[in-house]
């Protein structure tokens, strides 16, 4: 069954997508200020994996740990991590969109933050903003919703200190984007891009996002 984009877009008109770096921080701040419902795609992964089947979601069903003989995700080769994430997100996106359509009937405003198939969602979404975080202190692993790679590796008793450091360095290499072309796709899709850095506070960026979405013109806590 192929559902026209216009129908999906109408169903998602009260869903506001925040993409890029710092999206979780800004989404949580909007929740604090407006009591919005937050849909985190990272939090939905396990739920979607339980629904996946090898025919329709082969990448979601693959046992990469067994295939490559590793104990943690970040021990996989960098190219395997990139390929796995690309296809995993592509397969998971229709499942998340189905959930968002259902949730859109229960909430006046939904903030959807997290990784999703941007090219698939852009044509069916009315509200999207992309964040470019240029802060020199940004650490992908140093946040409450991400497992701290240093803590995880430090607890391993089967590795030497040198092996532990190699895994840590490899993990950071895998999550470090290519800044030279990091926002090319944002411009290609015609998305609003908001830059924040060491001179921009979380409050300022939250206000920029809220203003772009038109939230500041509405009554708080009425969602």
Give the label of every model feature segment.
Residues 2-9:
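Pre-Walker A adenine-sensing motif
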Residues 14-17:
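Short hydrophobic/aromatic beta-strand immediately N-terminal to the Walker A/P-loop
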Residues 24:
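Walker A/P-loop
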Residues 32-42:
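Post-Walker A helix-loop "phosphate-sensing" segment adjacent to the P-loop in P-loop NTPases
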Residues 46-108, 115-116:
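ATP-dependent small-molecule kinase phosphotransfer cores
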Residues 112-154:
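ATP-dependent NMP and nucleoside kinases share a basic, alpha-helical "lid"
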Residues 146-212, 216-223:
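Small-molecule kinase domains that catalyze NTP-dependent phosphoryl transfer to phosphate-bearing small molecules
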